[in-house]
Amino acid sequence: MAAMTPLDLTCHPASPAPVPLGVRVGLERSGSLLTLLWRVQADPASIVWPAPQPAGPADGLWQHTCFEAFIRRDDGSPSYTEFNFSPSGQWACYRFAAERERDSAPAAAQPHAPVLRFQPLIDGAQLVAQLTLPDPPDDDHPGWRIGLTAVVETAGGPLCWWALHHPAPRPDFHHPGGHVLRLPADRPLRSF
């Protein structure tokens, strides 16, 4: 299994964190199963963590602390899938035919429900999400390009927008220039 260092997300300069804060992501892929681990390092009291809710799909998760993955085929196609994972246990999945253009085709049905596990820590928290990739690998699969992001709500403060790469002057996780991580289809990968 190939190894990588966990990936540090950076806060967008237009939304600086008002408290000391760091966000890292690790990932592991085996077949069509992708496991993502977000680790927030901060004084736990300085972050607003959504209260537990029944597990299931929900909209508007990005309005509070949540973790996101944008996944597209690495073949130049404009279509992609957005996943949102909340510490509350709720999640969302949206498919797009192009940037911010929702896909209404029958094939855009919801995937299998992801499995989420949120764990408060003495110096922050972590969230693990296990999901089935929206486009399973086959012999001719080009692999994926992924944007890994986080929205962090600070206590008494604004939202901070974190990503592997910010290609625009304002936070925009849908921008294809932010989907910079290449995930090969021909071999497993582990970065935590």
Question: How should these model regions be labeled?
Answer:
Residues M1-Q53, G60, H165-F192:
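Order/disorder boundary and secretion-linked terminal/linker segments
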Residues A3, A58-P78, D140-F192:
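Acidic/polar low-complexity flexible segments
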Residues H12, V23-L27, P111-I122:
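Beta-strand-rich interaction surfaces with strong enrichment in secreted/lumenal proteins
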Residues G22, L33, H64-E68, Y80, ...:
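Extracellular structured ligand-interaction cores
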Residues L27-R29, V40-P44, R73, L133-D135, ...:
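Beta-strand elements of well-folded, non-transmembrane domains
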Residues G56-R117:
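Extracellular/luminal beta-rich ligand-recognition
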Residues D123-P137:
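Localized edge beta-strand/strand-to-loop motifs within extracellular or lumenal beta-rich domains
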